[in-house]
Amino acid sequence: MIKEKGILFILSGPSGVGKGTVRKKLFEEETDLQYSISMTTRDRRPGEVDGVDYFYKTKEEFEQLIKDGQLLEYAQYVNNYYGTPRNYVEETLENGQDVFLEIEVQGALQVKENFPEGVFIFLFPPSLDELKNRIVSRGTESQELVLNRLKEARNEIEMMDAYDYVVVNDKVQHAVDKVKTIIKSEHLKRERIAKQYKKILEDGLS
């Protein structure tokens, strides 16, 4: 039995497009996927477990990891760092498990630069009007912030060319089914398994 290396899948798209909803539904149906655990410098909250909820680091440790190139992406939010640790992802992939990362567009572009062999999926809204409705329905943003998010979304949509696949999130189940198809298709790509099968042939002829 050939043991395939896992694949890193990155789901990204503008704020309000439904990344979290699609990811949660996907994980209900695809139990073999490993969700990427983020690293942070924020304080651990009651009940949180290191290596389960986050990997917790001091600011000094985190900044050293940045210098050492040990983060696939990182950002600073409310005076704390958040990022995706390279070692965790690479070790999980080597064990044959797929890793799934749900992230904002800017973070995805950082991952693309640091880990170009990942599979990048852009979650696209059915329309900008629908995206606006989804953001407004949260009830957490002012009108000014909604307009800023829509402006940012337009800019992010223009970055779609950096992705391998585009999935329109018109209905959650439709989007999930398309992502599942992408995962299956990627595992059947010739370049991913050719070396392994060629070795079997060579061993059989030797």
From Swiss-Prot:
GO molecular-function term, one example from the UniProt record: guanylate kinase activity
Compartments where found: Cytoplasm
UniProt entry keywords in alphabetical sequence: ATP-binding, Cytoplasm, Kinase, Nucleotide-binding, Transferase
Enzyme class: transferase
Known catalytic reactions: GMP + ATP = GDP + ADP
Sequence ranges assigned to domain Guanylate kinase-like in this UniProt record: 6-184
Cysteine disulfide partners in this protein: none
One Pfam family matching this protein: Guanylate_kin
The family this protein is said to belong to: Belongs to the guanylate kinase family.
UniProt function note: Essential for recycling GMP and indirectly, cGMP.
Name recorded for this polypeptide: Guanylate kinase
